[in-house]
C-alpha cells in the first residue's frame, strides 16, 4: 500500500514492524526489554504482529529491582503466560545482598545498581547483541537525539557524539565483537500516539494507568502511592485515599501519580490533548541532577 494512503498510526506501526524484523534478521541473539509499562505493551503487540502466526524469535527480559508495583508483577506474569513468551527475569544479586533500596540509598544509587548494572549483567550473562527498548524521542531530551539503532561499546556505554546516520530507513547494524545495540522501534511515536494505538488495537495495560482511589502521600512534590508495608513514613506524612493514575510506571517509591478522573482510554486520550507537562514529571530518577538521563545512558542505562 502506498504510504500516502496509510493513516498516521498505521505508518508508525509499519515502521516499527520493519525495524523489529530487521533486527531479528540481522542480529544473532536479540532480546526485548520488557518493563511492563504501556510502551512495552505496544512494542510487544507490534512484535507479535511482525511474526504472526509464528511465535517471537527472541525472549523478553525484565530487569527486576524488587520495587515494582504489585499490579505490574501480576500483569507481567499474566501477559507472558497468555502469549506464550519466554520470559527472563534478572535481579542484581550483589544489589540484593547489599540490601539496596530507594528509601535508604536514594534514587540515583538504587537505579544505578538495580537497573543499570542489573541490565548489563543480564546482557552479558545471555550474550545478547541487540536489545529492544520502548523509549520514545518525545519523552526526554537525551532520548530525542538518540538514534533508532543506538550503539553501545563492550561496556554497554553510549556515546552521543559517535552515532551513525540513519537515512531513508536504512540501518547499519554492523558491530564488532563485544559491542551491542539498543533498538528503539517506538522512537517516532508520541505519548498521544501510544494511547490512541492502545485504544485502536485494544491492547491490555496495567490498571494503574487508569484513575482509581488509591492510598498516596505527598513527598518531595510528588504523590507517592503506598504499595506495600516497606514505606518509611517521615514526620508529618499522612496516607490519604485520592483519585490518581500514573502516566509512567517504575519503582513505586520513585514514581509519582497524577490526580485524575480518567478511568477509560478515551478519557485518558482527552486528558492528554490538554496536558502541558511531560509524562516523566513524576519520575524521581530524572531529578537526580541536570542531564541525569543522558549520564545514565552513557553508563549503560536503557
UniProtKB/Swiss-Prot annotation:
UniProt xrefs under InterPro entries: PAPS_reduct_dom, Rossmann-like_a/b/a_fold, SO4_adenylTrfase_ssu, Sulfate_adenylyltrnsfr_sub2
GO MF term (any one): ATP binding
One GO BP annotation of this record: hydrogen sulfide biosynthetic process
Keyword GTP-binding: no
Pathway: Sulfur metabolism; hydrogen sulfide biosynthesis; sulfite from sulfate: step 1/3
The reaction(s) this protein catalyses: sulfate + ATP + H(+) = adenosine 5'-phosphosulfate + diphosphate
Keywords tagged on the record: ATP-binding, Nucleotide-binding, Nucleotidyltransferase, Transferase
Assigned EC number: 2.7.7.4
One of the Pfam families matching this protein, by short name: PAPS_reduct
Keyword Metal-binding among UniProt keywords: no
Family: Belongs to the PAPS reductase family. CysD subfamily.
Subunit-level organization: Heterodimer composed of CysD, the smaller subunit, and CysN.
NCBIfam families reported in the protein's UniProt record: CysD, PRK05253.1, PRK12563.1
Record function comment: With CysN forms the ATP sulfurylase (ATPS) that catalyzes the adenylation of sulfate producing adenosine 5'-phosphosulfate (APS) and diphosphate, the first enzymatic step in sulfur assimilation pathway. APS synthesis involves the formation of a high-energy phosphoric-sulfuric acid anhydride bond driven by GTP hydrolysis by CysN coupled to ATP hydrolysis by CysD.
UniProt name for this protein: Sulfate adenylyltransferase subunit 2
Gene coding for it: cysD
Amino acid at each position: 500500500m502506498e504510504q500516502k494512503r496509510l493513516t498516521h498510526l498505521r505508518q508508525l506501526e509499519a515502521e516499527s514492524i520493519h525495524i523489529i524484523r530487521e533486527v531479528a534478521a540481522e542480529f544473532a541473539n536479540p532480546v526485548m526489554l520488557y518493563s511492563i509499562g504501556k510502551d512495552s505493551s505496544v512494542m510487544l503487540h507490534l512484535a507479535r504482529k511482525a511474526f504472526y502466526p509464528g511465535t517471537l524469535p527472541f525472549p523478553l527480559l525484565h530487569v527486576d529491582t524488587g520495587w515494582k508495583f504489585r499490579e505490574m508483577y501480576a500483569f507481567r506474569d499474566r501477559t507472558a503466560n497468555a502469549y506464550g513468551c519466554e520470559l527472563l527475569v534478572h535481579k542484581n544479586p550483589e544489589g540484593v545482598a547489599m540490601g539496596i533500596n530507594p528509601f535508604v540509598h536514594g534514587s540515583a544509587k538504587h537505579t544505578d545498581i538495580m537497573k543499570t548494572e542489573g541490565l548489563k549483567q543480564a546482557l552479558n550473562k545471555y550474550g545478547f547483541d541487540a536489545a529492544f527498548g520502548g523509549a520514545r524521542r518525545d519523552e526526554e531530551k537525551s532520548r530525542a537525539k538518540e538514534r533508532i539503532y543506538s550503539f553501545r561499546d563492550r561496556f554497554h556505554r553510549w556515546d552521543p557524539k559517535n552515532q551513525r546516520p540513519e537515512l531513508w530507513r536504512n540501518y547499519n547494524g554492523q558491530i564488532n565483537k563485544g559491542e551491542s545495540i539498543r533498538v528503539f522501534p517506538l522512537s517516532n511515536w508520541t505519548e498521544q500516539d501510544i494511547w490512541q494505538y492502545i485504544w485502536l488495537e485494544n491492547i491490555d495495560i496495567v490498571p494503574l494507568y487508569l484513575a482509581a482511589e488509591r492510598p498516596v502521600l505527598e513527598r518531595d512534590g510528588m504523590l507517592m502511592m503506598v504499595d506495600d508495608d516497606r514505606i518509611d513514613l517521615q514526620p508529618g506524612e499522612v496516607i490519604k485515599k485520592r483519585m490518581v493514575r500514573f502516566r509512567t510506571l517504575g519503582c513505586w517509591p520513585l514514581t509519582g501519580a497524577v490526580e485524575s478522573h480518567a478511568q477509560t482510554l478515551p478519557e485518558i486520550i482527552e486528558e492528554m490533548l490538554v496536558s502541558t507537562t511531560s509524562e516523566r514529571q513524576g519520575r524521581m530518577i530524572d531529578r537526580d541532577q541536570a542531564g541525569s538521563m543522558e549520564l545514565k545512558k552513557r553508563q549503560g542505562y536503557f
